[in-house]
Curated annotation (Swiss-Prot):
Its EC number is 4.6.1.-. Belongs to the ENDOU family. This is Uridylate-specific endoribonuclease C. Residues 27-303 form the EndoU domain. One of its GO terms (cellular component) is extracellular region. Glycans are attached at residues 53, 121. Endoribonuclease that cleaves single-stranded RNAs at 5' of uridylates and releases a product with a 2',3'-cyclic phosphate at the 3'-end. The UU and GU sites are more efficiently cleaved than CU and AU sites. The active site is at 181, 197, 242. Keywords: Endonuclease, Glycoprotein, Hydrolase, Lyase, Manganese, Metal-binding, Nuclease, RNA-binding, Secreted, Signal. Its cofactor is Mn(2+).
Length: 309
């Protein structure tokens, strides 16, 4: 889970951010509509209390970016359990998980992509393009004039956006990609966590004792529930601390790829933000571009349990 806000992961929302008053936000109704369509089509979403269980424990305190002096308000992991057999049985998750060990964690260290890794990237895209979620996203983007109807061209567009390597640091070789940053996570100069906004990666890193959940982040009267699909959290990873991260929890990789791709392609701004009402949540969706590639993408949780209604 992790930049600005930055953490790609479990259908939970994790990321660095400032909590703002949801009532002051202007909702993008068009994006809300298409994202809710995709939400309903996401048959591969894991169900809380059935396919996974989380333990929220205590509310995390304030810690400045770059500091490692953190008080742990969670003595146990965030994820109590996840039905890994179910995850592995779903093609998009299975192929997604194969990509998580393909990257160098530190920025400034050039990535070397093998032929096998290129094949894995393509296999993952092939899998998500077969889902109803990505088919609807593709249809929407065609209607907006942002993507070609030819499936091969759309796949090439996705590959460039998400997997093309670029320089995140000026020194060294091509050291990053949108997929690595958002879904896998990176560290910068050994001082801060960037990206890592995905719940599956969060769970797997926690399981390996590489990531330590420190507690949830929320406004005074907006305490999260164990069945929430978006969370703000604090955690440490390889000895570094992410003060606030936001991420989806339980959602499928195709859902995250779809919503962030739509937000990216329907705007030309360096940083695009859009407030959307999604299911029972109000979110600020954020995408930062690195040329024609994804720089980062994450959701900020503004309110849950329909408190914004």
């Amino acid at each position: 889970m992790a930049s600005g806000y930055d953490f790609g992961w479990i259908p939970v929302l994790l990321s660095l951010f400032t909590l703002t008053d949801a009532s002051s936000q202007t909702v993008n109704q068009e994006l809300s509509n298409i994202f809710n369509e995709l939400w309903k089509l996401d048959v591969n979403r894991m169900e809380p209390l059935t396919n996974y269980n989380i333990s929220l424990q205590g509310k995390a305190g304030y810690i400045p970016q770059g500091s490692t002096n953190v008080v742990d308000h969670a003595s146990s992991p965030l994820f109590v359990n996840v039905d890994e057999a179910k995850l592995s049985s779903i093609t998009t998750y299975a192929r997604f998980m194969k990509l998580l060990d393909n990257y160098e964690r530190s920025t400034g260290v050039a990535e070397r992509v093998t032929a096998e890794e290129v094949t894995e990237n393509n296999s993952f895209l092939d899998a998500i393009l077969e889902t109803a979620v990505m088919k609807r996203a593709h249809q929407y983007l065609i209607g907006k004039g942002k993507s070609r109807s030819d499936l091969r061209q759309f796949k090439s567009q996705l590959y460039y956006m998400w997997f093309r390597l670029y320089h995140r640091e000026r020194n060294g070789g091509e050291d990053s990609s949108g997929f690595e940053h958002v879904f896998v996570g990176e560290t910068k100069f050994g001082r801060e966590i960037m990206g890592l906004h995905n719940w599956v990666q969060f769970y797997l890193q926690e399981k390996q004792n590489l990531l330590d959940y420190k507690g949830y982040k929320a406004r005074a009267n907006d305490v999260p529930d164990a069945d929430d699909h978006v969370l703000n959290v604090q955690f440490s990873w390889h000895g570094l601390v992410k003060p606030v991260a936001s991420a989806f929890v339980g959602v499928s990789p195709e859902f995250e790829m779809a919503v962030f791709t739509i937000l990216f392609l329907t705007s030309t701004e360096k940083t695009t933000t859009a407030v959307v009402n999604l299911d029972e949540y109000q979110l600020e969706m954020v995408v930062h571009r690195h040329g024609r590639c994804i720089g980062t993408a994450y959701p900020k949780l503004l309110s849950s349990n329909n408190r914004h209604m």
